[in-house]
A protein has these predicted regions:
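Structural alpha-beta junctions
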Residues: 118-127, 142-147, 172-186
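Short, flexible/disordered intra-domain loops and linkers
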Residues: 156-165
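Extended interfacial segments that mediate partner engagement and assembly in macromolecular machines
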Residues: 75, 83, 87, 92-139
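Ferredoxin-type iron-sulfur electron-transfer modules and their immediate structural context
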Residues: 1-42, 46, 99-112, 192, ...
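N-terminal secretory signal peptides
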Residues: 164-212
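Iron-sulfur cluster-binding cysteine motifs and their immediate structural context
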Residues: 32-58, 67-85, 304-321, 337-345
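Glycine-rich phosphate/pyrophosphate-binding loops
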Residues: 141-157
């Protein structure tokens, strides 16, 4: 089975109640010369694997940790349980419950501390910290948290070790983004559950001081601001977030490019940064925003980069007698598809 056929089969098999798959966003599906397997490399449970040149998928092993979705630069994989909006509601609850000092804790850390999730109801509990992406952490600053703590187990010996490696990269990127926008909010990664989120005697899911049970709160909480803010930032980027396109109906646009989209996480990230402050730096080192460097002497103007770019960060330019491309770093996800498919390298 070819890599592309393997990817299509893989994406189809992992779709579940926990995970939504938008195969038209996958850069390896968009162009067979791409070599991205970030979701496979990040999988913490062995549900996705690449061995002996073959892609393997075992859906029953998926724990719904979301690390594959965090690793995917184009949001080809999205979490359904919880969704990003539901996770945001949990984070906002932790901000309120801890009086501005939210805690995100993984299941391994809770197990190591012999603490049930309901006995740490002030924290946001996730299967693995690899679930957290930069927009979620930057959002804590936008919601006026004083600091943020991510509590993990021993990631080196954890069966979900890839998630521990990824969250460290995410934390570093989030710190850099906040610093670039004038925020000094600390983001700490600790191998213990902070005492401030533990309930004396254990509540075992009983209602808190606000009279709302933790699970009922998470089930009913909505994040309406995300939709309004998302529309505003998407309009500023000159694009509207695309609805998933069924493979059978996927078409090339009038200008010869594949369908393009702005993932909700990118829109949410920019909205949060606008609330955090104004840029204080010209450059920032992070895995989620990039800038393409083009050697004009080598470029043959084939514009394949614009044809396959998933977000429109590189677009065709045909106006005023000018023939070429235009690059918008604000939409670049660092998927590196343009780099891999450029015939001139």
């Amino acid at each position: 089975m070819s890599l592309i056929n393997g990817l299509l089969a893989l994406l189809g098999e992992i779709e579940s109640d926990a995970i939504a798959v938008h195969e038209e966003r996958c850069i390896s599906v968009r162009n067979r010369n791409a070599d991205c397997l970030r979701c496979v490399e990040a999988c913490t449970s062995g549900a996705l694997a690449y061995r002996a040149g073959e892609l393997l998928v075992e859906p029953e092993r998926c724990i719904g940790c979301g690390t594959c979705a965090t690793a995917c630069p184009t949001c080809a994989i999205e979490l359904r349980n919880p969704t990003d909006a539901e996770l945001t509601a949990q984070l906002k609850h932790s901000i309120v419950a801890t009086k501005g000092h939210p805690v995100i804790v993984c299941e391994q850390a809770l197990e190591a501390a012999n603490v049930a999730a309901d006995d740490a109801s002030a924290a946001c509990a996730v299967p693995c910290l690899g679930r957290m992406d930069e927009s979620a952490l930057v959002g804590l600053a936008a919601y006026r948290a004083f600091d943020a703590t991510l509590a993990c187990g021993s990631c080196e010996t954890c069966p979900h070790a890839p998630g521990g490696a990824l969250v460290r990269e995410v934390v570093e990127g989030a710190r850099n983004l906040l610093e670039a926008f004038g925020s000094s909010m600390p983001i700490d990664l600790e191998e213990c559950v902070p005492e401030r989120v533990l309930e004396p005697g254990g509540s075992h899911g009983q209602a808190g001081s606000d009279g709302v049970g933790r699970r009922d709160f998470f089930r009913s909480a909505k994040d309406a601001s995300t939709r309004a803010a998302g529309a505003a930032v998407a309009e500023e980027l000159g694009m509207v977030e695309a609805e998933p396109v069924p493979a059978a109906h996927r078409k090339v646009g009038a200008d010869g490019t594949l369908s393009q989209f702005v993932p909700t996480r990118r829109v949410r990230l920019y909205n949060y940064l606008q609330h955090v402050g104004q840029p204080t730096a010209d450059e920032v080192e992070t895995r989620v925003i990039g800038a393409v460097s083009i050697d004009a002497q080598k470029c043959s103007s084939c514009r394949m980069c614009a044809v396959f770019c998933p977000t429109g960060a590189i677009k065709k330019l045909d106006e005023g007698g000018v023939f070429g491309i235009v690059h918008r770093p604000s939409a670049c996800m660092q998927c590196r598809l343009c780099e891999h498919i450029c015939p001139e390298q």
